[in-house]
Amino acid sequence: MTQLNPTVEDAMLSLRSPATVMDLERLGSFSPTRLSFARRLTRLMFEQQWKVSRTQFELDEKGHGFAIYCLQTPAYRYHVVVFSRHLEDAQRTDRVIAEAWDLTFCLLEGEVDAELMSVLSANVPLQEAGRQHPRLLVISRANKSVRAFATVSTALASGQQPDIDYLKQAGYLYRTTAVYGNGKFGIADFDRLKGYQDFWQPFSAQMAAVYMLREFSVDQVEHIARQADPGRAVALHPEAR
């Protein structure tokens, strides 16, 4: 039996210490790769030509109400249901113990009929305090960047595009404060997701839900701008999206 002698390069290699690898500043500087959860999902969406459509959009002039989006893949159909409400500034916190949020939403398998919508309306806004339906794959909540949201909606309502450099300072219109999956609060367990070719990889369902939140945030801010000035309001430029 031939025994391979270690090369000089092999002898010099050694594992880095956890203190080096897990340093928070170092971790925060990592760039996305092909293995990153979001890029892996969006690559699959592009390759398979997933279709996203807005089926209901029941918002008032301030953007409060609900919206339903359909996510159609080659194999399955899913829906994302979003609930938007008024939130006092004193209630807006990113801590996990919060009990109210600007937005709550869910990703679920199949169709949304009137009976299911009634259940979702009563429970999804409550998050962990609600009785969640087992067809839900993901449940989440988010708070807005008040300044960024106001800046974008005001600019669009006046017929202008928001300043990109300013938007980069916040980087978002909404930020999730928790994204739950894998059986949390009674929703579908990961074992169930293994049967779906769309979401069998870890965190892919969660990333799909967050992707749809991003779409809703743009739809909502454009809606608010149109309500403020129907004659001058413009849509957000694709480069800003």
Indicate where each model-derived feature is located:
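N-terminal low-hydrophobic presequence detector
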Residues: 31-37, 65-67, 191, 200, ...
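Mixed-charge, Lys/Arg-enriched low-complexity segments
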Residues: 2-24, 99-241
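Amphipathic, interaction-prone secondary-structure segments
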Residues: 43-99
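Acidic-basic catalytic patches of nuclease active cores, encompassing PD-(D/E)XK
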Residues: 25-51
